[in-house]
C-alpha cells in the first residue's frame, strides 16, 4: 500500500520580496524543476541552490522593463552617462545597487520606456496589462499531492484566470519564440503555473497561460501566444518526472549527475541525426 502524502494547504502571499521568494528552500519553483532535467541534473541543481550567484548586470534591462510594464520591482536610478567607462558612472551604479535600485544609463532608460510604451499600444498585450485589472507577482504555494513536494510560482501578472508571462528576448519572431520555448523548457513553466493557480483556487473554471515576448531591438515588436495543448501535456509530464526526482533526492540525500550510479562505463555517440547522416554517407 502506498503511504499517504501529507498535503499542506495552498497559500497566497502578497508583497513577498523577490529575494525572499527565490531564497526559499522549503519549496521548489519552475526553474528548479527545469534544472533537474537534461541538460541539467540534480548535482548541478543542488550546487547552484547551495551557492547562489551574485547579481548579473545583464538582467537589469529585463528587470527594468518588468517594472515599467507590471508596476512591480526595484526602483530605477537613471545614471546620466553615455556608458559605464567613467569612474563617476561606475560609482553611481554601485551606489544604486547598494540601495537596491536598478541603475540604467540614460539611453537604456529611454529604451525600456519605449518598450513599455510599445506594450501599452499593442492590441492584445496592452489590454492584458491594464493597470488595476490584474495583480503583479503574487507568490503562490501548494503541495504536489503525488510526492508531497511543496511547490511555488510567482506569476508576472494574474488577470482573473489568465496568467500573463512577460519575457524580453533579442528577437520576438514566432520561430525564435518557438525555439526559446524548447531550449528553456517554457512548456514546463506554462503547465506548472497553471497547476499552481488552479491548486490555489484562483481559477475555479480553469486557468490559461499567455506568453508575451518582446524584442529588445527597436521597434520592440511583440509576440503574444498560448501554448499548444500537446506541448503543455509534455511540460506537465516533465514536471511530474522532475518532482519525483526532487523528492527522491531530498529523501536520500543523493544528488546524482547525468550518469547516476553505474557498474560499467556507458557509451556515448553523436546526436542521432548526425549518426544517421554520416552512416549513410560513409558506411553504405
Regions found by a protein language model. Name each.
Residues 1-152, 259-260:
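Metal-dependent nuclease catalytic cores that hydrolyze phosphodiester bonds in DNA/RNA
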Residues 9, 192-284:
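Metal-dependent nuclease catalytic regions and adjoining charged, substrate-binding loops involved
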Residues 15, 39, 78, 91, ...:
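Generic detection of intrinsically disordered/low-complexity segments and helix-coil linkers/edges
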Residues 22-23, 46-48, 98, 167, ...:
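Compositionally biased, intrinsically disordered low-complexity regions enriched in proline and serine
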Residues 41, 56, 86, 173-174, ...:
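Alpha-helix initiation/capping motif
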Residues 108, 112-115, 189, 235, ...:
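Amphipathic alpha-helical interface surfaces
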Residues 131-236:
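Mg2+/Mn2+-dependent nuclease catalytic core
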